[in-house]
Amino acid sequence: MGQLYEKDMSGCGIVGFMSENGKVIPGDRVITAMASMHERGNGLGGGFAAYGIYPERADFYAFHMLLDHPKAKTETEAYLKSRCSIEMDEPIPTRRNELVSDTPILWRYFLRLKPESAQDGDEEDAIVQMVMDINAKIEGAFVASCGKNMGVFKGVGYPEDIGAYYRLDEYQAYIWTGHGRFPTNSQGWWGGAHPFSLLDWSVIHNGEISSYGINKRYLEHFGYQCTCFTDTEVLAYMFDLLIRRHRLPIEIAAKIVCAHFWDDIERMDEKQREMFRTLRTVYASALVNGPFAVVIGHANGIVGLSDRMKLRPLIAARDGDMLYIASEDSAIREICPKPAQI
């Protein structure tokens, strides 16, 4: 008799917190929060995004690179030098950890774009194109993050081990996000761990996006190349498209990605009904379907979104100037035992 296998559905753990006053928080706090959700992952991916960690080089684009071999590093550096001036480059500091293995070359570059490299004068569009080129055309090279005064630290392992490996206890940031991965549709590899990032956007995600194919094709019309074959990648690019390029408020972008049901739209007053009908029609291919909970980080804050049926957990809390979002109440209380609101 054949053996029956059931698909393990996603149980990723996510957390994000920030100081509204810009107060910096040590990295051991986000590691502690993620460690409390150890059972939500399976050791095939952990990662963090941190904002405000490079104040002495805040005006430079900080490229965090994952490089499989020396040739990838050589080709990446040649490409970067052809378009940018490199202020400084160095290995990303790490600490030996027996639970983290098969590590790529981890390198960071602090860059200024050469004036002639800007596309129609738009510096950020040029940086995005560089990321697309490196990820798609240089074998063994992957841009983990490229924003200013922020960085993504990720890899294969449990998040608390990845955090210790990257020495996150030595960093301070005014925004932290963390993710423990339980991959369901793609393999566990260093580039596939969360967060996914573009410019100062970073996305962590728990769930499954069934609209990946439609979303991917839609983004490709605007020049984005989804090379990781993972659903979370499309979310990072989608928010860049809607907010930075289409200049939509983040509240409207959220209503596009997590659109109202048509039945709900029909019950709205006339003005709202017309607006949401238009959004659903114009941005039909930007609608994200499936069970999911998402935390989006950017230089000015964090945003939590969940699917319209709330099929993945997402808890929010506040204490003073601190805001928290997490998959579980316990992750928040581990670092803020008695929040003022939850």
Task: List where the protein language model places each region.
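Conserved short alpha-helical segments that host acidic/polar catalytic motifs at enzyme active sites
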Residues: 1-342
